[in-house]
């Protein structure tokens, strides 16, 4: 294989932070190279330097052995670098062809769009990827996997020979992820070099050739995939051995106070009617395949989605909860699946995000915010959940995924919530940060807070939950507890391998 990309002795600093220190990284033609590290290790900064978003303070970039100087994102794309970020750059109301050629549309001598030519090129790229996409539909009508293939097609239309894929399977089903891997293998055979960023070790071992590990802005080492064990990689990432990321479970008490009694939640007329209870200080897991109705049931309970029938009591009192605001007044908070879009205001500081839902708590006469009091509350709560940041004035958009999730938790602690709904709480979060989130959840339940945890990661559901409600096709088919909370039992019920008793 030929050396396609070399990053040599790259360093980058921000005010008060040394983000990268003397990092070197090499990508071969036709290689899939994993870039591993905890959130905050420097992966995103390094890739933003590669794609021209940031300019390095020291070091150089070489493509095909020749030095390049990227002062802008377009410089990188012109040099054959394509990046598929976690947050897609697609315009939702435009179709796939329009998105692929956005900003560089093909036109004739009169300035008219050459739509047939653009469509023909788009079809050719899709054939190269071996994907079948409705090129005429607005991209927001496509599945997440199809949108991702549009992003890849967009990069390939620019003759990208270097692709960076940042957590590409985070929102994909297993079948969609396998389809993506087939596409990646095809591109690999065509000589495209790929940088693959993922926190899922099984994916690294399935698709990658080589691994480079970063920690705290330093390169810890690189390894061939077939020559390194998972435990060694984890130790390289976090700087210590990880024996078990899940906290020890305490014996389940069946006599605990019932905080939520959902006697009936029906999303659609003639649809299934679900019922469940949540006890004080327990973690109730919602498990099931993607599209099984887990999130929809939780959102309907708190009024974020409509329900044609809802009978719910909170601490023994009937609760209509027609809106999330009413649910919040009842002491129920939601940590949404998409924390960046729905859980946080990224340009706002840590302080502003923590106090946003309860400004009355930090306001004085005439409802004027007491900045000193606000800062004290934010600092106390951020310390409690161990947010890693220079100070509470740091914009949350500058934080790692794990620290962003901690800010969302701190916000709900500021509201003294009795029940927290965690929707995919560790999605896009590294191993070390996951352990901290689990520790926080355990601390909250020890203080009497009840948690509903919706997760697509079976080890997480099994390792954290006291009881598990298993969903299939919109219906809770079984509630497991004790020794029955294991991966085999959950999958048997989730896939229809057994009937509910």
Curated annotation (Swiss-Prot):
Main location, first listed in the record: membrane
Membrane topology: Peripheral membrane protein
Molecular function as annotated in GO: ABC-type D-ribose transporter activity; ATP binding; ATP hydrolysis activity
Record's catalysed reaction(s): D-ribose(out) + ATP + H2O = D-ribose(in) + ADP + phosphate + H(+)
Lineage top rank: taxon: Bacteria
EC number: 7.5.2.7
Cell membrane is among the record's keywords: yes
Ligand binding (ATP): 37-44
Compartments it resides in: Cell inner membrane
Residue ranges of every copy of the ABC transporter domain listed in the record: 5-241, 252-498
UniProt entry keywords in alphabetical sequence: ATP-binding, Cell inner membrane, Cell membrane, Membrane, Nucleotide-binding, Repeat, Sugar transport, Translocase, Transport
Record Pfam families: ABC_tran
GO cellular component labels: plasma membrane
PROSITE patterns: ABC_TRANSPORTER_1, ABC_TRANSPORTER_2, RBSA
Entry similarity comment: Belongs to the ABC transporter superfamily. Ribose importer (TC 3.A.1.2.1) family.
Subunit annotation: The complex is composed of an ATP-binding protein (RbsA), two transmembrane proteins (RbsC) and a solute-binding protein (RbsB).
Reported function: Part of the ABC transporter complex RbsABC involved in ribose import. Responsible for energy coupling to the transport system.
Protein name as catalogued: Ribose import ATP-binding protein RbsA
